[in-house]
Amino acid sequence: MLKKTLLSLTAVSMLASAGSALAAEYKFDKEGQHAFIEFRIKHLGYSWLYGSFNDFDGTFAFDEKNPSADKVNVTINTNSVDTNHAERDKHLRSAEFLNVSKHPQATFTSTEVKKDGDDYDITGNLTLNGVTKPVKLDAKLIGQGDDPWGNYRAGFQAEGTIKLKDFNITTDLGPASQDVELIIAVEGVRQK
């Protein structure tokens, strides 16, 4: 009886650990320009200023049936900030904002993924300007399936908000310009 119980417990623990290992690994499709990291911030409270980071890389693990096995990792070259205005971009790269000479990369590493209806709540650590803080992203699965080139793809859009001061960006842009909205749209190619 004890032997059967031990065998059952061993089998259950192996299945549980195998479940977390079943999440498929995906790499962001940057070559086809099917991945974007964008942001927007209010300009003095009068309008939105939009920008993006053009150089980044990332991976995610996705198991639709076991979201707790899902993971997201993103690395951003902060020097690639682009708001369609060269002087503003230069200012954003300076020590007053992103301080790219001292902090050339920003990273996001998920710590937990939970399914919430049709959406996913992704919690993780964002390191920006040398400061690491927890951030929550609300993500949606846009679609998944085979592509014409023999690969399998999955696409997500995630959104979240960060406060500039939380990341030691203390330049005062006025009370309406303290929060930055993040929009991340990625299409990942499943790794074989």
From Swiss-Prot:
SMART domains: YceI (SM00867). Keywords: Periplasm, Signal. GO terms for cellular component: periplasmic space. Residues 1-23 form the signal peptide. SUPFAM superfamilies: YceI-like (SSF101874). It comes from the Bacteria. It is found in: Periplasm. InterPro entries: Lipid/polyisoprenoid-bd_YceI, TTHA0802/YceI-like_sf, UPF0312/YceI. Belongs to the UPF0312 family. Type 1 subfamily. PANTHER family: PROTEIN YCEI. This is UPF0312 protein ECA1782. It comes from Pectobacterium atrosepticum (strain SCRI 1043 / ATCC BAA-672) (Erwinia carotovora subsp. atroseptica).
